[in-house]
Amino acid sequence: MSTEHVDHKTIARFAEDKVNLPKVKADDFREQAKRLQNKLEGYLSDHPDFSLKRMIPSGSLAKGTALRSLNDIDVAVYISGSDAPQDLRGLLDYLADRLRKAFPNFSPDQVKPQTYSVTVSFRGSGLDVDIVPVLYSGLPDWRGHLISQEDGSFLETSIPLHLDFIKARKRAAPKHFAQVVRLAKYWARLMKQERPNFRFKSFMIELILAKLLDNGVDFSNYPEALQAFFSYLVSTELRERIVFEDNYPASKIGTLSDLVQIIDPVNPVNNVARLYTQSNVDAIIDAAMDAGDAIDAAFYAPTKQLTVTYWQKVFGSSFQG
């Protein structure tokens, strides 16, 4: 096995040039999200009984796993009060109305309810902030209920605990855990473009890689870490239950009949992969097998040109070695 032609540094350079959200852009996005937070906090200080209690950045930007293709920010808003609607449409309209009150300088068309969130648009930058409502009743750790984008059900969650979960893995593998997550997400994004039946949630990718890290996989060599990821998908066929005990004992998880079982590290009754079918699994395994075979072939390719050709099967034509 050789990484003479494409090695860890080559993949790291590709990630910096093509995969990662540039730091300047990430800082700008965070600054705009912070402005919204500050506006809400200022409004709350003058209106302490206001139903919107806290705004917390969530999603890939907050986790540090955002791709270069990111063009909006995910933010959770905690809503308290008995008058908050319990149905999706009503809740989003309610949230939009409250946001317009908290941000009076925004015109009505800059605050628009969407399918599962309310989008706040910044005119100057063209940036959109997707604000997701979380119903909050005062539970510790900011545990509340958000609406599942898969089936519209209410799920208990804690944005701070989710962020702490990722931070713990980033501490265990500084720089490298987040980078391997971004590389795997980039691959999955490419597969979605190339393969019509392919679906693979970013949250599932994060949790699978977190489990591999917890199990001792070395993330400091990107070709080998990616190969470990693809090998895991193929060897387990996603039939291995993935559980974390950061916030609850594994014994809290009951018997499940779901095909794929990747349990939310904050909520033991939420299987984040519960809707994945055998067809979905087959598509992931087929793509992972092709990627793993390509990396294997790249390790033994006699020339740089051939090595790059194999890596392009993983990362597409933008990979030039």
From Swiss-Prot:
Disulfide bonds: none annotated. Gene3D superfamilies: 2'-5'-oligoadenylate synthetase 1, domain 2 (1.10.1410.20), Beta Polymerase, domain 2 (3.30.460.10). Its EC number is 2.7.7.-, 2.7.7.85. Its cofactor is Mg(2+). GO terms for biological process: defense response to virus; nucleotide metabolic process. PANTHER family: 2-5 OLIGOADENYLATE SYNTHETASE (PTHR11258), C2H2-TYPE DOMAIN-CONTAINING PROTEIN (PTHR11258:SF11). This is Cyclic AMP-AMP-AMP synthase. It comes from Escherichia coli (strain MS 115-1). The gene is cdnC.
